[in-house]
């Protein structure tokens, strides 16, 4: 897997997903020299946005990241709405962490 964070963000943007970029990649865009190996976002929680996010994740080939093999499942708006806090995903372009209720 090659880490292509801009490819992940382009797909989210192409689907009209409203989100805030946070974490290490956001810091790198602001000049931080610290390395990062994932993209962290906080998506807007309205149903339409979660539907668009689900479509973007499908287009990215996102799977649920686990301690072992990633789990393939249907990730749609209803699935995302049921997530209480966080969802860790992997894509062919790198890992993507969704935070639904940031601290």
Regions found by a protein language model. Give the residues of each.
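Compositionally biased terminal segments of proteins
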Residues: 1-103
């Amino acid at each position: 897997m090659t880490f292509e964070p801009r490819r992940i963000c382009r797909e989210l943007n192409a689907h009209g997903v409203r989100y805030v970029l946070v974490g290490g990649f956001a810091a790198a865009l602001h000049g931080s020299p610290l390395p990062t190996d994932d993209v962290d976002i906080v998506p807007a929680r309205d149903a339409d946005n979660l539907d668009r996010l689900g479509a973007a994740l499908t287009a990215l080939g996102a799977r649920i990241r686990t301690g072992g093999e990633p789990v393939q499942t249907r990730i749609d708006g209803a699935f995302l709405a049921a997530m209480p806090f966080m969802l860790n995903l992997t894509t062919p372009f790198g890992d993507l962490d969704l935070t639904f209720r940031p601290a």
